């Protein structure tokens, strides 16, 4: 059973597997995910993710939230995507980590995402942007918890906030999460991607 979330607003939600101590099963089948607001900034997301891992001891971490889509992208407003790569925008190349999911999210189009400090940064090959993804992945990697990210597109990058379709994006996200919790629960340990840090960032082995 998925706990009801009190509004999506602009705050991503980290959905967590049940505490490890209660089950040694590799997936989430038969377990109740926990959900927490992860905040609307890199610092808030990092703190919330770390706190959730300490409190819940999850098998998996799934970050869910809204995103803006860059004009050249084929991703539509209202669509939900699985983030295939999360980049830290604005850092010098030598410091620019790239993060990739460490378990599979089935059934969604994938997209490359920029983690930005402000909206409107150059896409540099990314299709969507958000603020929290890289911080979330960095904490998950440091603590050794498999992690993935999904985003519902609420706006085109550069649009004023007044025209963002936040409610529509949150509804689409809630529908997908209800399906994903069951599907992710059937993922076997053989389907998990190894968690490691490399010169290109954190991601697939």
Language model regions located:
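Serine residues within intrinsically disordered or low-complexity segments
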Residues: 6, 23-24, 186-189, 198
